[in-house]
From Swiss-Prot:
Database matches in InterPro entries: Pox_A_type_inc
Name of the protein in question: 27 kDa A-type inclusion protein
Ranges in a coiled coil: 4-210
A Pfam match: Pox_A_type_inc
Superkingdom: Viruses
Keyword annotations of the record: Coiled coil
Amino acid sequence: MKPMPKQREMRRLRDRISDIERQLSDCRRNNESNADMEREMQRLRDRIMDLDRQLNECKRNGNGTSSEEVNRLKTRIRNLKRSLEICSKDESELYSAYKTKLGRAREQISNLQESLRRERESDKTDSYYRRELTRERNKIVELEKELNKCFDAKYIDEINSKKTRISDLERQLAACKSNGGSNGNMDQYKREIESLKRELAECRRGNNGSHSDCKYYDEEARDCVKS
């Protein structure tokens, strides 16, 4: 026995309700974080339950179901469909906003990654130049030490030369005295000896560590090497 037209219509309506209910469920899962959307979906869910209850009553009543009742159910479904379209539209707008925000976040991440890469490259370059600067400063200090040795050697030679000259003059002075030389010659020897002794003392003071004439020291380089 074929189902009566009204029974077929009720079945179609029930299938339609099931489909709408499924769509609403999907909409709910995609918008759980939105409180307003959640309330709207709950309202739609309540309507579906009410409509489903009425359809069940129609099924129990069988042929007694009036066309007016079926039309009323159709109207309710249309209203429900419009509400679902609103929900879907809101969902689409939320998804579009999410995609826009996600795109901006990805762009920011990409920019940060590029900045990090440049900073790392810059740090490598800075480290290279710092190492080179330290190496050159060490060279400067070593060269200054060698230069200082040269000054020390120079003044050691000068001191030895003056000491030799003093010894020679003292021998000449002694010989002059033993030979009965004139006071003028002896005074000259004495003055020259005293002068050389003063120069020798000044030379020794000037060569205490390093001579003041050595102006080539790089103080900054020495301080950096010490630290």
